[in-house]
Design a protein with these regions (language model features):
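Short acidic (Asp/Glu) and glycine-rich catalytic loops that position anionic groups and cofactors
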Residues: 54, 76-80, 105-110
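Short hydrophobic alpha-helical runs that function as membrane-insertion/retention elements
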Residues: 1, 60-61, 82-84
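Residue-level "edge-of-site" marker
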Residues: 5, 47, 65, 88-89
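Donor-nucleotide binding loops and adjacent catalytic segments primarily
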Residues: 1-39
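Class I S-adenosyl-L-methionine
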Residues: 11-15, 73-77, 111
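A donor-sugar binding/catalytic signature common to diverse glycosyltransferases
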Residues: 27-73
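C-terminal amphipathic helix plus adjacent low-complexity
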Residues: 92-134
Length: 134
């Protein structure tokens, strides 16, 4: 989990509570994570959504702004993601993540959109490689 300036207090909390399956950092290379993950929990910003689609990763959107709420609704309509409006609803979030992990969404649609994105923008990979390396 990338949390910027909040990484130290969250790491302290994780150590104190002996939580072993969460990694906290001020920066995490998102492309690397997306290339190896099954579900992406994100606030639903445009670039994060594009990167998740590129890597064919279903998303759980936890929107903060109205744009992100709209993005979540669009992903739900396409069948390639879920949206939650409260991180306090643990049971709801758990069931949404399980739904995404069980591929109870439109995997064909996610593959189709990802392939379209890759084909329409032949320089997408090289652009991100350039940004990441520089």
């Amino acid at each position: 989990m990338a949390v910027g300036k909040f990484s130290e207090p969250l790491n302290n909390y994780i150590r104190e509570n002996k939580i072993n399956n969460i990694y906290i950092s001020s920066f995490i290379p998102q492309k690397l994570i997306l290339s190896k993950t099954d579900v992406f929990i994100t606030s639903g910003g445009h670039n994060s959504i594009l990167e998740a689609i590129y890597y064919k990763v279903p998303m759980l959107i936890t929107p903060i702004s109205s744009e992100q709420r709209m993005n979540g609704l669009l992903l739900e309509e396409l069948g390639i993601g879920e949206t939650t409006y409260s991180l306090n609803k643990n049971a709801s979030i758990s069931s949404q993540i399980n739904k995404l992990l069980r591929k109870q969404l439109n995997v064909n649609k996610l593959n189709e959109i990802s392939n379209d994105l890759r084909n329409q923008n032949n320089n997408f990979k090289s652009m991100w490689d350039y940004i990441y390396d520089n």
